[in-house]
Swiss-Prot record:
Organism of provenance: Methanocorpusculum labreanum (strain ATCC 43576 / DSM 4855 / Z)
Stated name of the protein: Phenylalanine--tRNA ligase beta subunit
Molecular function GO labels: ATP binding; magnesium ion binding; phenylalanine-tRNA ligase activity; RNA binding
PANTHER family: PHENYLALANINE--TRNA LIGASE BETA SUBUNIT, PHENYLALANYL-TRNA SYNTHETASE BETA CHAIN AND LEUCINE-RICH REPEAT-CONTAINING PROTEIN 47
Quaternary organization: Tetramer of two alpha and two beta subunits.
Amino acid sequence: MPIVKLNNEYLTRLTGTDIETIRSSLPMMGSEVEREEEKQTDVQFFPNRPDLYSAEGTARALRGYLGIETGLPTYEVKPSGISFSVDPKLANIRPYLGSAVIRNVHMDNAMIESLMGLQESLHWAVGRGRKKVAIGVHDLDKIEGPFSYIAADRKTTFVPLDYDVEMTMEEILAEHPKGKAYARIVEEFERFPLITDAKGRVCSFPPIINGELTRVTEDTQNILLDVTGIEPRAVSVAVKILCAAFVEMGAEIESVEIDGVVSPDLRPEKRTVSVSECSKLTGIPMTASQMTELLMKMRFGAEVIDEDTVSVDIPCYRADIMHDHDVYEDAAIAYGYDKIETSLPPSFTVGKPHPVQKLYSLVRNIMVGLSYIENTPFTLTSGDVSYSLMHRPENPAALHVLHPISEDQTIIRTDILPLLMESLSINRSRELPQKIFACGDVVENLVTYPKMAAASIHTSADFSEIYAVMDAFCRMMSIEYEVRDSADDAFIPGRRGDIYVSGEKIGVFGEINPDVLVGFGLEHQAVAFEIDLRGFVSNE
């Protein structure tokens, strides 16, 4: 979770109260104050609330929670007359673009620092290290529309931010600090994303670096915002959060036409919720009018429909509200968790570790002893990662998400190994060797069961290495196994094997297929094994 550094003077100015009140209120809103200094407060927010990753967003929420300013923030968006065109050649590179014009910005150093912090936090929380989303902020008065988002030749030159000489895009990836850090996102493509103005001047090379031409300073008054990415919802979320933050700075928002589509859309989402369900779920007795007051403290628009129904307007920046229960959680936060009365359970019981957790602890101890580092991948993944990239047939027993919010999270994982391969891909710029493992639940046909997997990548990884690691793991788990020929196309024929116990297949191991390595963007040989742990859960 990101640590948000809040300037005390700026935060109190935005909130309208003193820093002591702010610091005492933040934990009750679901955050954790990490450090308190004379001029700065460091706060850790949960990843589901990226709208709080700035002094502006935090102040907006605090004003509601403290009753200083409640209800739905409203955002007037005027047309700017500025347009963007998107090159169809970007379809398989970085196809999505969001934008807005920010007028009448009067920025001091605290505002610039807050904006830069929000930008980087969104790159982490929403953008997955700029792969899914990257943000560009430009001084609009230095450039002219209409603007073009194009797939440019790799030899295109411009002066990158913090430099005073022109460089080709290839040179930027090889030499510029930001280029070296994020080259992995675009280096595989024949052409690179580029944003230019009406005169062909370069504004940005997303997701790598802006041009020095459009640097934002304290003298900047009008801003062009660009957000590019590979997932349209994530792009839209980032644009909305940034626009809402600029409004807190006193700026005005104007829309941009992107191939005829207007951006941003800052209208609230409407939803109706049940008062009785909220009371039952939270344990807080309340009426419809009381629930309305609580939700308005959390900056929702709320109106009583009848004694059990409340109409809710969800602010555009609240990307975390995906279910009625998310609204009920906010009502409980506004009520105050410290005010909820505790009660003893009606019966006395003694807790003990769950057998599956005991098994996982044993697996962790063994793998750490074998010099592997634990990885904790997400439970939700995609069919592309689990099957297509692994050269495996789609599993008909996979449980699909009905309304996925991201193309990366469409199924509940049925295997652990594909997620380890994805982790190796994300960390391919790190030093070798990398030896990682993970253990956790997978789901097939609505049945949840435990699995583990391990993977190793380095210049000399081979079948003998992973066979030895798998054998050591099985011996320490007291697993008596036999190896048979495998037909798993995720591994190289002749350098793979299935693991059998009592005539039943429980796993697979071997050298990863070169085609799989290419799919994940890996340049070195990798080896891996995966084992179904269902048969080793103790009944004690």
